[in-house]
Structure formats: structure tokens, C-alpha cells
UniProtKB/Swiss-Prot annotation:
Catalyzes the condensation of ATP and 5-phosphoribose 1-diphosphate to form N'-(5'-phosphoribosyl)-ATP (PR-ATP). Has a crucial role in the pathway because the rate of histidine biosynthesis seems to be controlled primarily by regulation of HisG enzymatic activity. Keywords: Amino-acid biosynthesis, ATP-binding, Cytoplasm, Glycosyltransferase, Histidine biosynthesis, Nucleotide-binding, Transferase. It comes from Listeria monocytogenes serotype 4b (strain CLIP80459). Pfam families: HisG. One of its GO terms (molecular function) is ATP binding. It comes from the Bacteria. Lacks the C-terminal regulatory region which is replaced by HisZ. This is ATP phosphoribosyltransferase. Belongs to the ATP phosphoribosyltransferase family. Short subfamily. GO terms for cellular component: cytoplasm. It catalyses: 1-(5-phospho-beta-D-ribosyl)-ATP + diphosphate = 5-phospho-alpha-D-ribose 1-diphosphate + ATP. It is found in: Cytoplasm. Its EC number is 2.4.2.17.
Amino acid sequence: MKALKIALTKGRLEKDAVALLEKAGIDCSSMTDKKRKLIFHSSTQPISFILVKAVDVMTYVKHGVADIGIVGKDVLMEASKSHYEMLDLEIGKCQFCLASTPDFDPSSYRRKIIATKYPTVASKFFREKGEDVEIIKIEGSVEIAPVLGLADAIIDIVETGSTLKENGLLIYEKMYPISARLIVNKASLKQNKTQIFQLIDQLEQVIKEERAE
């Protein structure tokens, strides 16, 4: 039986994903002592894991290097769809928010400048509102953009809001909820249908049980 390759997002989401996979009966013990390794093979099941950055999960899945990926909905919303989004894992929950300084007027008719790491999401949001805005893409700490006068407001993902508060920003609108999703390579789904759907069924059962608690 061909080993399923699962691409995981490094960092906090990785820990939540591994915990969920283990509850679903997936052997993740090979990842216990990671050190600097990025590829792991289960010794008891035909499964291996790849640890990569969030945006690279989609790349590995798209090109079939990974059969399955676990990645945040924020990454999926920003990229072109070249995969099947199979399951909301209900972990890594946060939301897209519009935030700015206390003197920001969201109802102003003046053309706004919006700083964000997610220009596609920002464009969609303001297009749906019928607003024409200028969008500046920032890769780093987007929170300082309105404080320094680079932008009128920002669009970013928010979990607790503590980083916004520390930088003197307020949330003006909660936009889209986000959570981790399980995505599958289109060719892999055809070739490994039984294995993949078995994994999905196991995960769905765990999610259902946790939701009922």
C-alpha cells in the first residue's frame, strides 16, 4: 500500500493538527523528537508527514508531492484553487478583521488605503461592499501601518486581538471566520480514494465527538 504523504503547517497549527490526527488513530510518534527534521515516516502505518510553511502546503499538494495538506482557510482564500477542500477541522480558529486607529472613519467616502498580507481577500471584501480602495501588500507586522500613516486601516487575521490592542488599534469589522482545512490533491483522491476517505471519516468522528462535549 502506498504511503499517504501529509503536509502540515509548521508551528502552532502543527501542534493542533498532530493532536487531532492522534485522536483519530493516526501514528504521529515519529514527530515526537523533531530536532531539525522536516520529513517523518510512521513505523506502524503507511503514512508520512512533511513540515512546511503554510503557503507551501498548497504548493506541495498542488504538485502531488503531498497527497493531503492541513492549512488555514486564510491561505486558501488568498490562493487559486487547485485542490479539493474536503473538511473543516475546526482547529486554529480565528477571523479576518478590518482594524485601525481610534480616529478611523469606516463610513468615509474618501478612497481608503488598506495594508494587508492578504490582497486577494481584501479586494474581495471591499468589492462586495462596493468600495474602491488602494491596497498595499505588507509581509511583516501589518499592525504598524496605520500608526505610521502608511495606510488608513489594515485587514489581518485576529485570534485574541491582543496584538492589535498593544499597537493601539481597534476592530471595526469582523469579516470572515477562519479555521484549518484538510485539502487533497485531485489526482491523489482518485488513486488513493479508500485511504483518504478512511482518514477523513476518522477525523470527522473525532470532530463530531469534540463538538458534542
